[in-house]
Amino acid sequence: MPVSIMNPLICRLSLVVTAAALTACANHQGLYQWGSYEDQVYAMYSSPGKSSPDEQIAKLEADGERARAQGRTPPPGHYAHLGYLYFQTGKLDQAIASFETEKVLFPESRTYMDRLIGRLRK
């Protein structure tokens, strides 16, 4: 190739490679704001009794508030787990409200959440 054609080609190619490299290095936020959700669920099953349901509720509620403040969504299961914790503490109305929120945010959970809500209302 003649030198005059090669220089613009090399320039364009280097620009494309640079743009691709910068895009790959960009900090991508995840789809959900996980907060302490995974740690809470893990601790609940791996070390039962280490953290009371009330302590877990406080942490998950704070995570939910933080996610809303950032315009993000808590992960799937967040409100279902919160509802379960409310159930454990006898707060059935709050449990149902959490299950309803899970249904709205994650429609694929509707069948399971409806079943749980139905059992709580009996």
Regions found by a protein language model. Give the residues of each.
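C-terminal motif of bacterial Sec signal peptides marking the signal peptidase cleavage site
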Residues: A21-A24
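Structural register within alpha-helical repeat arrays
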Residues: H81-L82
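Residue signature of alpha-solenoid helical repeat architecture, marking inter-repeat boundaries
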Residues: L31-W34, T73
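TPR/TPR-like alpha-solenoid helical repeat scaffolds
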Residues: R110-K122
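Bacterial signal peptide processing site
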Residues: A26-H28
